[in-house]
UniProtKB/Swiss-Prot annotation:
NAD(+) binds at G9, A10, A11, G12, A13, I14, G15, N103, Q110, V127, G128, N129. GO terms for molecular function: L-malate dehydrogenase (NAD+) activity. This is Malate dehydrogenase. The keyword Oxidoreductase applies. InterPro entries: L-lactate/malate_DH, Lactate/malate_DH_C, Lactate/malate_DH_N, Lactate_DH/Glyco_Ohase_4_C, Malate_DH_AS, Malate_DH_type2, NAD(P)-bd_dom_sf. Catalyzes the reversible oxidation of malate to oxaloacetate. NCBIfam families: MalateDH-SF1, PRK05442.1. It is an enzyme of class 1 (oxidoreductase). The keyword NAD applies. Keywords: NAD, Oxidoreductase, Tricarboxylic acid cycle. Belongs to the LDH/MDH superfamily. MDH type 2 family. It comes from the Bacteria.
């Protein structure tokens, strides 16, 4: 049976980088037929039409149709998978509260449209930043959709962390397992080497603590800014790749721990209801579970408190703005 995949901000750089990979079967598998729905703001609809033309011109066997709209109700109607990529970027002189409010005007109505029109088995990935709190807004405005269906992307942070560690140790990325990121998708995030393994060895035992704390953690957290500085534009292909990884493993399963920002049920002391990145096991079928009993020592706890504190501040700000109850 065909699946409907809705992509917002479809005419943007990440949208352009991801749509062809979805249509080729890299996200939902090589046998899954699909229909794409592209949601864009009115001024970008013509660009989205051009992308749709190219998608058709690729003659992907799995792609049944491409629909383009500026109406969230149409875009999310019958959607099985929603990739919320479109977001308001921070502009010069903008305070964080302004950014949260601007994005609230996007993610509040999208949450409602998902609630009212998406398929019963919908799964949602928020990519647009600030991703954790945008996810919180959408989730809180979709009260009829189980909150386990909503997630925000921290897989790009994980992929960056894995690659940097592999380069440091001179190993392949496939030798690094269970390396996850906790907390917010921001420079406060905490990449966890205590529970990660490299060729079966504890990752934290293979590096100097000084390097871990003062070089590795800050560089993972600020990698996005480093890329903007180098190429004059934000990460697009790597963000698209991480979104593919996230949804593929969520739907089809994975044999390693991975990072997903999901609603907390109080695990590891993270306040109930906050959308925080956690380590997750992914059995497939759009399910996830947060494992118990992972090592969270004093160092990790101190880092967690900082990033969770930031998430609480963002939550309180959007609550004050009336974007969540």
């Amino acid at each position: 049976m065909s699946k409907t995949v809705t992509v917002t901000g479809a005419a943007g750089a990440i949208g352009y980088a991801i749509l062809f990979r979805i249509a080729s079967g890299q996200m939902l598998g090589p046998d899954q037929k699909l229909r794409l729905k592209l949601l864009e703001i009115e001024p970008a609809l013509k660009a989205a039409e051009g992308t749709a033309m190219e998608l058709y011109d690729c003659a992907f066997p799995l792609l049944e149709a491409v629909d383009i709209t500026a109406d969230p109700k149409e875009a999310f109607d019958g959607a099985n998978v929603c990739l919320l990529i479109g977001a308001r970027p921070r502009q010069r002189g903008m305070e964080r509260a302004d950014l949260l409010e601007a994005n609230g005007q996007i993610f509040k109505p999208q949450g409602r449209a998902i609630n009212d029109h998406a398929a019963d088995d919908v799964r949602v990935l928020v990519v647009g930043n600030p991703a954790n709190t945008n996810c919180l807004i959408a989730m809180n405005n979709a009260p009829d959709v189980p909150r386990e269906r909503f997630s925000a992307m921290t897989r790009l942070d994980e992929n960056r962390a894995v690659s940097m560690l592999a380069q440091k140790l001179g190993v392949g990325v496939e030798d690094v397992r269970d390396l996850v990121v906790w907390g917010n998708h921001s420079p406060t995030m905490f990449p966890d080497l205590f529970n990660a393994r490299v060729k079966g060895q504890r990752a934290v035992d293979l590096v100097e603590m000084e390097w871990y704390e003062n070089e590795y953690i800050p560089r993972v957290g600020k990698r996005g800014a480093e890329i903007i500085e180098a190429r004059g534009a934000s990460s697009a292909a790597s963000a698209a790749n991480a979104a593919i990884d996230h949804v593929r493993d969520w739907m089809l399963g994975a044999d390693s721990l991975h990072s997903m920002a999901v609603a907390s049920s109080g695990q590891y002391g993270v306040e109930e209801g906050l959308v925080s990145s956690f380590p997750v096991r992914l059995p497939g079928g759009g399910e996830y579970e947060i494992p118990e009993g992972l090592e969270v020592g004093d160092f990790a706890r101190s880092k967690l408190e900082i990033t969770i504190g930031e998430l609480k501040e963002e939550r309180d700000a959007v609550r004050k703005l009336g974007l969540i109850g």
